[in-house]
Amino acid sequence: MEHKALRVIISGGGTGGHIFPAVSIAGKLKELNPETEILFVGANGKMEMEKVPAAGYKIVGLPITGLQRQLTLKNIINDLSVPFRVVSSISKARRIIKEFKPQVAIGVGGYASAPLLMAATKMGIPSLIQEQNGFAGLTNKKLGGKVQCICVAYEGMERFFPADKIVMTGNPIRSVFVPCTQEMKEEGVKEYGLDPAKKHIFVVGGSLGSSKFNQSMRKWISEGCPGSEGVDVLWQCGKYYKAGIDQFMAEETAKNPALKDTVRYSDFIGRMDLAYAAADVVISRSGASSVSELCAAHKAVVFIPSPNVAEDHQTHNAMALVRKDAAMIVKDADAMEKMMPTALELLRKPEKIASLEENAGKMALPDAARKIADEIYKLV
């Protein structure tokens, strides 16, 4: 296939789970042809307005916001303004399209994706949706009938989209996430100061940390780390929670000096690939990117889906693996009692771990960005 220079608009963002796939797709398009021009469209005030320029791409913001779930005066005022912001955003999106003259429009989810794709499809611009999750959101479901191609990462998405438009590509992830080797494991154990003679659990509640994960860890630690013989734990607690965890750990270590040999914690883990490699069992939320990374790394994982997401999509993501015996799941409501005991019990079952690793690897979809880029070229 010839990879001629293109003019491409990529819209969406709001969370890293939308932004990273978008940047990955852009990077692959530029790799195939450095002359390709790419313009991002995001939502004013959202993280894409910082993250995308940091990745080297131009971005334009729309005045779009979403409906707020909590009932406060500020949120009520925001919600009343949403229809006007949508109209204004669609109008601005039309102007952006007229000026940039894209050959293809791509939506990756998030507030800005909807008005941009609405405008693009009405203006006859070939369009593509990249749906990261196993349960499609309302906006993408509505847009699915208007775009030409829908790239997905899970089976069964014909529940939400026209079957003839669906292409199974997987979610773009960083190239460092590969099947973990013994050499990588040894490097990860050394990187994070773990005991090579022990088994290892990695607890990660997302880049910002998880209050529920942290509460569950504090409960387990305050009870004396039951079941931790021959085990150490690497725990990403999140920057927001770090000060409180520092104080808690100082108090607990004073009572139990051996704690410092059982639990290592940090506000942020920079080398996730090495942390995954070091771990015999991972405890994780089940956002789309995390699921794809863990499959690529062939890891045994206990998923605890976040309840604070639209359409409960993290549960759908996790269950896609659980049904294939490629992961385990604990409900968020049960995490305080079951998070650590479930992981520790799994750690004592090497045959189960091996089975989970093998089946997770079977669900990996490598080179997703290239597959999506190929679909983009088919539209022009």
Regions found by a protein language model. Name each.
Residues K352-P366:
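A short, well-ordered alpha-helix in the C-terminal region of glycosyltransferases
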Residues A5-T15, E35-F84, K239-Y241, D332-A333:
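Conserved nucleotide-sugar phosphate-binding/catalytic loop shared by glycosyltransferases and other
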Residues L71-V104:
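An amphipathic, basic-hydrophobic alpha-helix
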Residues I10, L39, M47, K58, ...:
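Active-site-proximal region of nucleotide-activated glycan assembly enzymes
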Residues K92-A105, A112-L128, K141-G145:
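Glycosyltransferases and closely related glycan-assembly transferases
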Residues Q70, E183-K190, L194-V282, T315-A318, ...:
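Donor-nucleotide binding loops and adjacent catalytic segments primarily
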Residues L365-V380:
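C-terminal alpha-helical cap of glycosyltransferases
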